[in-house]
Design a protein with these regions (language model features):
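Membrane-embedded alpha-helical segments of integral membrane proteins
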Residues: 33-100
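A transmembrane-helix-recognition feature enriched in membrane-embedded lipid enzymes
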Residues: 278-297
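Non-catalytic propeptide/linker segments at domain boundaries
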Residues: 89-127
């Protein structure tokens, strides 16, 4: 009787695993052909089925590593905004494999290096989190809004939240002028700066209070070009600039501002989005900050 039950559980587990693979393939296809939000719930359902199947199978190390790698694959390719969760799971899967194959001495070295890496990661995140807030409470003259993805001519959700933060600031400080900064990237039919201008004017912001910068393709260029616009107006950015961006991005944006001589740029944190998506970008930002510390850009 027990063996019969175990066989039924194994059969159910393999059926669930097959269903998970079908749903995963469907999610990837939907994402590939741009089918709106549908890839996300389908990918989530695939992940749930995969986890349940693994629970039934009671996996050995190889099955556990394969499961983690499969979940990482789903998060990386089928769920927009969760790629760095996928990388994290892939790293854990690699640790599972290394634990099985490495001699004890080498495994201890891997554990020590991993712990050092985690401590370093926490240190970097402390700087990012400390600056992930609005500190522009003194009415700066210029508000630089950093661009983000545009789908065709439509601002992404991340960019919309930045624009909402900028609009709120302009309402609070009626003498401030916004500089919307961003060039045209892949898949975009208008420059990000123009898309931001169109969105803000359509949502009640006076066009005379918005200056367009439409050439920048990076945070560095956003700030260099925006500072140049301020100087062309006969002004200096020092003491007069606030930067609008996603909360996780403000620390690095301020580092770039300091690099170009504006040591007191304030930050305006855009409203937060989905919690786990935001955590994904906080994870990613640690690598961006590290790149700046090492290479200066």
């Amino acid at each position: 009787m027990t063996e019969h039950k175990n066989n039924k559980k194994r059969l159910l587990a393999w059926l669930l695993l097959a269903a998970a693979l079908v749903l995963a393939a469907a999610a990837l296809g939907m994402a590939r052909f741009g089918m709106g939000v549908w890839p996300y719930p389908v990918a989530a359902a695939a992940a749930v089925l995969l986890i349940v199947a693994v629970a039934f199978l009671r996996p050995n190390w190889a099955a556990l590593a394969a499961t983690l790698a499969s979940l990482a694959f789903l998060l990386r390719f089928a769920a927009r905004g969760y790629a760095w969760w996928g990388y994290a799971l892939l790293f854990v899967a690699a640790l599972v494999v290394l634990h099985h194959f490495l001699p004890a001495v080498l495994w201890k070295i891997v554990v020590i290096l991993t712990c050092i890496g985690l401590v370093y990661f926490c240190v970097v995140e402390s700087f990012i989190i400390k600056n992930a807030r609005t500190d522009a409470d003194d009415g700066r003259d210029y508000l630089i809004v950093l661009g983000a993805a545009v789908y065709g001519d439509r601002p992404s959700l991340t960019l919309v939240r930045r624009l909402e933060g900028a609009r709120d600031y302009l309402q609070q400080y009626p003498d401030a002028v916004a500089i919307v900064s961003g060039g045209m990237g892949p898949g975009e039919t208008v420059a990000e700066g123009q898309a931001m201008y169109d969105y803000m004017t359509a949502h009640g912001v006076d066009p005379s209070r918005i200056l367009i910068e439409d050439k920048a393709t990076s945070t560095e260029e956003n700030l260099v070009n925006s500072f140049a616009i301020i100087r062309e107006r006969g002004d200096e950015p020092q003491g007069k600039v606030a930067i609008v961006s996603s909360a996780y991005h403000l620390y690095r944006a301020k580092l770039f501002a300091q690099k170009f001589g504006v040591s007191d740029a304030a930050g305006v944190a855009a409203p937060w989005g989905y919690f786990f998506v935001m955590l994904n970008y906080f994870i990613r930002e640690a690598f961006g900050v590290t790149h700046f510390w090492v290479f200066g850009n």
